[in-house]
């Protein structure tokens, strides 16, 4: 998808969806929509394997998805009031000691 091969990406995602008994993705997805669809599929396929949060952080979608979840559960907007400095994990102390050019992530 990121290299512009939308149809090829859609083919692979549709194979996964078909195996699960789901409908194919819509035919008219653009690159951003396909990226979101792929992130969602990864979230369902790899549930509880520890990838979802990191995928969302890497693509800048963590707060968006967390806020969607709160809206779904509570039926109204309840923005995530957690400390946004905790989106990134701390860099291990050993890594900081080995490389003085590293800067610790905000909030740690």
Residue ranges and their predicted role:
Residues 1-108:
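Acidic/polar-rich alpha-helix caps and helix-coil junctions
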């Amino acid at each position: 998808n990121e290299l512009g091969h939308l149809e090829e990406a859609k083919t692979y995602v549709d194979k996964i969806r078909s195996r699960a008994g789901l409908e194919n993705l819509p035919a008219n997805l653009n690159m951003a929509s396909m990226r979101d669809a792929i992130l969602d599929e990864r979230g369902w396929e790899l549930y509880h394997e520890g990838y979802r949060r990191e995928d969302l952080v890497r693509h800048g979608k963590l707060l968006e998805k967390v806020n969607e979840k709160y809206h779904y559960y509570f039926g109204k907007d309840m923005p995530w009031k957690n400390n946004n400095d905790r989106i990134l994990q701390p860099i291990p102390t050993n890594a900081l000691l080995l490389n003085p050019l590293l800067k610790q992530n905000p909030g740690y």
